[in-house]
Design a protein with these regions (language model features):
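Short, hydrophobic/aromatic-enriched beta-strand segments in well-ordered soluble domains
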Residues: 71-75, 125-135, 216-221
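Short, solvent-exposed loop/turn elements at domain surfaces
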Residues: 14-22, 47-50, 80-81, 137-140, ...
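Surface-exposed binding/hinge segments that line
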Residues: 108-181, 210
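Alpha-helix-centered segments that form part of catalytic cores
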Residues: 179-209
């Protein structure tokens, strides 16, 4: 063990590292937070929500039983290839949670009050969640881990249908061969374990994943969060 290494003994293997399809607690609580990020997360001292990918907690508007939550992404936030994290990545991530052919049963109930996401052509860092009013809506929507569309859907297959169609479980989607091909790949063990495919905006990248032996992550050089490292505990 070198001075810049930390070795942690786990009682069991992580089942995978796909934030949508992997449900085991070890992966979700101890490994994935190093690789993936969300709009918001919890301050471990106060247990209040604090911004991570978002610039701030959302502005919330209520209209009867409908709520709208406005978020804006941090301008510093980028993926490993240097491209900015945008509204397209947010919408894509939520489409994977609602796509009927994706193994997403562990996540879908936590956001089943969502009706749609509004995007803004003049500002690709701004989004508005439109949902049924729900007491846990800010943390439910804000803490879902965001995926890079360019890695997980390079052909932009899920863009064929709007998010509202995925939420409504539109029959056209269920019968679409391209969506089925996407889902089969997204559900695969390779996408949950291959270091070239397990990609997020967090401070660490997956180096190797050997069942029964070790899982190695490495801190990224020139990580985007280093630019705002005094913002909060997540940087």
């Amino acid at each position: 063990v070198y001075k810049d290494q930390v070795v942690i003994h786990g009682l069991s293997d992580a089942k995978g590292l796909n934030p949508v399809t992997t449900s085991d607690a070890y992966a979700n609580e101890y490994i994935m937070p190093n690789i993936f990020q969300s709009l918001l997360s919890y301050d471990h001292q106060t247990m209040g929500l604090i911004p991570v990918l978002a610039k701030a907690r959302p502005t919330v508007r209520l209209n009867g039983d409908v709520a709208e939550l406005d978020f804006e992404l941090r301008p510093e936030a980028t993926w490993d290839n240097g491209t900015p994290i945008t509204a397209d990545d947010i919408v894509f991530s939520f489409k994977t949670v609602f796509c009927s052919m994706v193994n997403n049963d562990n996540l879908k109930p936590s956001v089943d009050y969502l009706k749609d996401i509004k995007t803004y052509p003049d500002n690709n860092r701004k989004i508005t969640f439109i949902c049924n009013k729900y007491i846990g809506m800010e943390d439910g929507l804000g803490t879902l881990r965001i995926l890079p569309e360019y890695v997980y859907d390079p052909q932009k297959v899920l863009r064929k249908y709007p998010l509202s169609n995925y939420i409504a479980a539109n029959h056209s989607i269920a019968n679409d061969a391209a969506i089925k091909t996407f889902a089969d790949n997204f559900n695969s063990e390779k996408v949950a374990r291959d270091s070239s495919l397990v990609k997020g905006s967090g401070a660490y990248r997956l180096i190797s994943f050997e069942t029964g032996q070790r899982l190695i992550v490495e801190r990224k050089a020139n990580w985007w969060g280093d630019k705002i490292n005094k913002e909060n505990e997540y940087f």
